[in-house]
Amino acid sequence: MNLILFGAPGAGKGTQSELLIKRQGMTQISTGDLFRAAIKGQTDLGKKAQEFMDKGQLVPDSIVIGMVEEVLQKGVQNFILDGFPRTVAQAQALDELLVKMNLSIGKAIFLEVPMRILMDRLTGRRVCKNCGAVYHIVSKPSKVEGKCDLCGGEVIQRNDDKAEVIETRLKTYEEFTSPLKEFYKKSGKYTEVDGNRDTEEVYKEIEKIIK
């Protein structure tokens, strides 16, 4: 089954995607990872995406759709779309792309988390500059402060995880992404999961939904 996993920044999409990859053999298509790889490689799309991400703004559809299409053209199956689509316009463009490629989405799962919890999660998040491993200063700190447990790389706070940018990101999310709920409710593929719980509890509920 192909899934869309969506919710506000910090809702736990990446964490749940990792579990689905390890336990269900699924493939994650994370637009955030695609952006960061493009930025690190200093590609044309990466440079354009960085300008928007650093301000906490949504990356334009033309850039996002292009990156997703490139991945799907490699023949990926049983995938999770993490962080995409973020708007109804993107969802419509995705539907057109999937029809063209003879693919479909089985479920669109929304992770619901209160705004104050999202702020706490995001401002405390730290990421390895080298391998992308994710930590949290309270719930999942690295063993040595500022150093990645996995590769020894520098652990930093991303620009888009700073308080002033987060506030913009969450407001942008509410404005553009919330209508996605209605879009997928109409398609009959929408399911909501309480993301403000233990990681395992959230995973078990998602597992039931996809079986």
UniProtKB/Swiss-Prot annotation:
Region (NMP) location: 30-59
Keywords, sorted A to Z: ATP-binding, Cytoplasm, Kinase, Metal-binding, Nucleotide biosynthesis, Nucleotide-binding, Transferase, Zinc
Subcellular localization, as worded in the UniProt entry: Cytoplasm
InterPro entries: Adenyl_kin_sub, Adenylat/UMP-CMP_kin, Adenylat_kinase_CS, Adenylate_kinase_lid-dom, P-loop_NTPase
Pathway(s) served: Purine metabolism; AMP biosynthesis via salvage pathway; AMP from ADP: step 1/1
Location, primary (coarse class): cytoplasm
Keyword Cell division recorded: no
One Gene Ontology term of the molecular function aspect: ATP binding
Binding site for AMP: T31, R36, Q57, L58, V59, G83, F84, P85, R86, Q90, R158, R169
Catalytic activity: AMP + ATP = 2 ADP
Class of this enzyme: transferase
Enzyme Commission number(s) of this protein: 2.7.4.3
Binding, Zn(2+): C128, C131, C148, C151
Residues at which ATP binds: G10, A11, G12, K13, G14, T15, R125, V134, Y135, R197
GO annotations of cellular component type: cytoplasm
LID as annotated region, ranges: 124-161
Gene3D superfamilies: P-loop containing nucleotide triphosphate hydrolases (3.40.50.300)
Domain of life: Bacteria
Family per similarity comment: Belongs to the adenylate kinase family.
Domain comment in the entry: Consists of three domains, a large central CORE domain and two small peripheral domains, NMPbind and LID, which undergo movements during catalysis. The LID domain closes over the site of phosphoryl transfer upon ATP binding. Assembling and dissambling the active center during each catalytic cycle provides an effective means to prevent ATP hydrolysis. Some bacteria have evolved a zinc-coordinating structure that stabilizes the LID domain.
Subunit structure: Monomer.
Function: Catalyzes the reversible transfer of the terminal phosphate group between ATP and AMP. Plays an important role in cellular energy homeostasis and in adenine nucleotide metabolism.
Protein name: Adenylate kinase
Organism: Bdellovibrio bacteriovorus (strain ATCC 15356 / DSM 50701 / NCIMB 9529 / HD100)
